[in-house]
Amino acid sequence: MKYGFFRRLGTFALAVALMIPFGAFNVRADSGETITVPVDSVNGTRWADIIVVYKDRPTTLQNEWGWNVVVSADGVVIDKIPGGDARGKNLAVPEGGFVLSGTGEAGKNMYEAVNIDDNAVFDEYGMRVLISGGDIDPFYKTSFTFTGRNATRYSNTLIIYDISGKRTGTNGYGFEVCVNSDGFIISAGGNDSVVPDGGFVISAIEPADKNLLKAYCIPGAKCVISGNTVTVSYDESMMSATVENELRELEKEIQTAKSQLRLVDYDAISERIAKIDPEDVFDLESRDIVIDEIKSISRMLIEQREVEVRSVWYVPLEKSQKAVYKTVEAMKEAGINQLCLGIVSDGKSIVRVPDMKIYKADSRSYHFDILQTYVSACKEQGIELVVSIPVFFGGDGAACTPYHTLTNGGEINAEHFASPANDEFFEEITEYFSYIATHYAIDGIQYDYIRYPYFDGTTDFGYDDASKKLFTAETGLGADVIDGIAKQLRAHENWNDWVNFKTSLIDRRVAELSEKIRSLRPDIYISAAVANDTGADFYCQNSSHWLAAGNVDGIYPMSYSAGIFPEATKKFGSYMTDSSYLIMGNGAYMSLSLDEMYRQFNEQAIFGGDGIAFFEWGAYVDHGYAAAFEKDVMSKPALSFTYAESESIEALRTMAAARFELYFAESGKTGDTLDTDMSLVEMYTVLAAYGNDYLTQDIELALRIEKMSKEDKKGGNYLVAESSDEPSSEASAGASGSVEESGASVTDSDASASSDSGEAGNSNALPWIIGGVLAVAAVAVGVIFGRKKK
């Protein structure tokens, strides 16, 4: 179906109610009307009650428990596959077409509203699929009411924020639309948005309201407020207006980039912009071509820093040495310079440690030394290898049952956390860390789950005998007080004593573990994956103290939701010392939009991050992020400063000089070139005199690298013995490994990632793990999101 066949629909409620979770469709495409299906993700993991479009890939890589509509390259529905039908498993995607796939009521309602031979168009810019039994009309006008202005976004509210330049301050669970001073929507999605100058933000939290905004409030639409009513419209005249608006926003981005002294090719950007003519836009297809070009230009404004950690979390699924080499080679090609390898998953260790009590051995470890193969493969590719180990999380719990912490109801929680107060467990986990540190030439160790489970206001943790005895010994408060805390929680007068006790206990365990590791391996960096929520009683995880005390070198906050990177990066950045570093955790597994992924990559650099870590490798590849990033923002290699210290410092000197030159070029002032032969302190002094923080950023990082350097410790004889299970020459060649060996195919693998940096595992395998029955899928995803978003 061609775009030229669009006919005018007029004013029509575009079946937003149809997409409300657990609602019922009251309009069908065969009625001749155009219905709109809001799309949550492109090529993402199909979580519960969401709609995903799969395109430009061979298959969906999902299980059979979704409701599927298959659309040909001509824009015609050619097949419908209900949830549970085996044909929907890893469904083929038509070349040039797409698959519309959903779960839960949202998916079922979409499926029932569509018929074979209906016309369908995916408007990716607006993140919606338009479907009709006749000609498709992309235009509309509708109105809805809001409940308040500049107020807290509670449940059952739809809020307008209109204080220019101020953030909305919302959490990561809603959906926001930004409107500029001309009344055009300039962005849709995310949270904690900055209110545009002279414009406003529409913010929703309820599922029905979020779907309302997704269906109607697409970028480029006109948005007008009258009283407590918002009217949104989109017509032919807005096609070219959309492009003009995007160009204006791009110009603002350019000015921002220059003010932040980003080292990008401004001349090349100007040349590409000059070739764009809004008058070339006359329908959705031509609009999308121009918009894609503008987005491509916008991404040129993201600086490719020469020194930056580009990390990825991954729990290995490979079954052979050859497959390991192939995986690491793929990471290198994607621009990854650091791998955080999870070596424990669901209570199983890929390393067979002698007399290991707290973990079972992964069955693959009897066939080859998985970790040693990763050590060798990463060394060959020049990738920094950080081993990530869950400290108190037990996974399936079989091996750590004697050490469990208990809830205030006396129960073992589903995540099987060990008690931080249990000395026997801590001795065992310390021995495990020590064995890894002294038997493998790793570059770093990362603490995962070094905390209590999340306190949700009702279920608290730490009521095992070891914890209660220690609390009484340290505070003098007896069993009656502990029983009272268990019942009253935050309302109890000694609640803060309880929280401080648990927090202090975690602090001590971090210090003890780091002291032991550093006594064995002074040459490696120690980091921690930490929760984004830092409320005192949420996790009892005081990472700012760990950094201040020097007990960890760096932290990786898991700030996975859309729209929260700026504030999260600034918050955790305030914890930094002159000898620590910050790598921001990105939720690739959450099926974030590609625009959001680029935005977060840029924001972590702008707001004080030293790099980014994607959770996790399988999702990063399957969702198309790797293929996109390696074409632009990660097309050039970067140095990890915790791996190549001296080289990083020299590169930062050069970057500082280039930024100094750009500063004078943009300000119109004249000045001397920066002498890169000066000491770092002298360079910093010269640059700081200009009062511009962007001028000093490179040397500030160089000074931190110099202060926390482990370089003088490198080359020491710290290993007890090298593993005898060296990779074969065939493994080293690596290139001929099969797809199945590399863990890249869709299988019914039972391997999954149990790490605090994310429990989603490899996204190729995850859909089958979640699958089984739809209800089980919803529960599983609920557990994952409940744990990760908090």
Language-model region placement:
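Sec-dependent signal peptide cleavage junction
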Residues: I20-G32, S754-S763, V783-R787
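Active-site-adjacent "subsite" loops/lids of carbohydrate-active enzymes
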Residues: V307-W313, K319, V375, L385-Y440
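Catalytic domains of carbohydrate-active enzymes, especially glycoside hydrolases
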Residues: A323-S349, H439-D443, N551-I555, F607, ...
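Polysaccharide-binding and catalytic clefts of secreted carbohydrate-active enzymes
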Residues: G410-H545, A549
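C-terminal low-complexity, Ser/Thr- and acidic/Pro-rich disordered "stalk" regions positioned immediately N-terminal
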Residues: Y718-S763
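C-terminal membrane-anchoring or membrane-association module
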Residues: G772, V776-K790
